[in-house]
């Protein structure tokens, strides 16, 4: 109810502000219906831009404050066992590369669990070839495969979590890759018992087109900066 009231108040204030702007600047515009509509549209876009600028400013401010004050204890002997769960659906063309990136991680105490969510291509056959102990950066890494009927990503993740016996779980998509330092950098935060989850920095690999550049910008603003700002107020409600 409070959220609804806040939205109503915000909408009301913006509407009143827009009306006042149009009213006081109306004498300087042409008195045709088309011109009035055009002017009202420009004013609306201007107000929207102002709101966005304030939003980005406060996001950057709170993200900076959080990153500036956040500290964690360092323990060079803290390397808990981690299960990396990879749910896949029709990822036959990329799953091998994704698993190859996981085998290069700068970490030794982990396993990889592939969950095939009823794929209709050759995903199961490709994943099956990866099962067993594969050579990692420091030691052999166990790769397991769960084959289940299609039920969606959530059920696939739950199947992997149920299979895992590790202290920590890392979930990633079948068409994604992790940088080598991911586990070492992420796991160190869990030495603080108050930490419940850690999100990574999502980056777009194939930034060759305008669309992918815009997608990368969306990740930076919508995930990285926004989550850091939310962390300052202890209001993060979803990972990532």
Language model feature labels by segment:
Residues 1-78:
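N-terminal membrane-anchoring/stem segments of glycan-assembly enzymes
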Residues 69-70, 91-104:
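Short, well-formed alpha-helical segments that are part of the catalytic scaffolds
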Residues 80-83, 111:
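Cell-envelope/extracellular polymer assembly enzymes that use nucleotide-activated donors
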Residues 88-96, 116, 120, 124, ...:
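A structural helix-start
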Residues 99-149:
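Acidic donor-binding segment of Leloir-type glycosyltransferases
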Residues 122, 126, 174-189:
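Acidic donor-binding/catalytic loop of UDP-sugar-dependent glycosyltransferases
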Residues 135, 139-140, 149, 154-156, ...:
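Long helical/loop segments within the catalytic core of UDP-sugar-dependent glycosyltransferases
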Residues 169:
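Short aromatic/hydrophobic "clamp" motif used to bind/position activated sugar donors
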């Amino acid at each position: 109810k409070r959220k609804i009231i806040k939205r109503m108040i915000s909408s009301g204030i913006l509407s009143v502000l827009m009306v006042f702007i149009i009213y006081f600047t109306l004498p300087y515009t042409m008195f045709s219906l088309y011109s009035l509509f055009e002017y009202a549209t420009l004013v609306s876009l201007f107000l929207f831009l102002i709101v966005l600028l304030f939003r980005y400013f406060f996001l950057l401010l709170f993200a900076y404050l959080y990153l500036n004050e956040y500290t964690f204890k360092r323990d060079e002997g803290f390397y808990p066992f981690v299960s990396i769960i990879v749910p896949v659906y029709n990822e036959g063309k990329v799953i091998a590369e994704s698993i190859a990136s996981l085998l290069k991680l700068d970490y030794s105490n982990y396993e990889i669990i592939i969950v095939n969510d009823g794929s209709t291509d050759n995903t199961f056959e490709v994943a099956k070839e990866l099962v067993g102990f594969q050579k990692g950066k420091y030691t052999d890494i166990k790769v397991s495969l769960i084959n289940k009927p299609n039920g969606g990503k959530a059920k696939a993740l739950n199947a992997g979590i149920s299979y895992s016996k590790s202290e920590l779980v890392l979930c990633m998509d079948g068409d994604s890759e992790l940088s080598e330092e991911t586990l070492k950098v992420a796991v160190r935060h869990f030495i603080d018992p108050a930490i419940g989850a850690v999100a990574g920095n999502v980056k777009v690999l194939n930034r060759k087109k305008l669309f992918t550049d815009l997608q990368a910008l969306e990740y930076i603003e919508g995930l990285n900066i926004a989550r850091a700002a939310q962390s300052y107020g202890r209001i993060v409600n979803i990972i990532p």
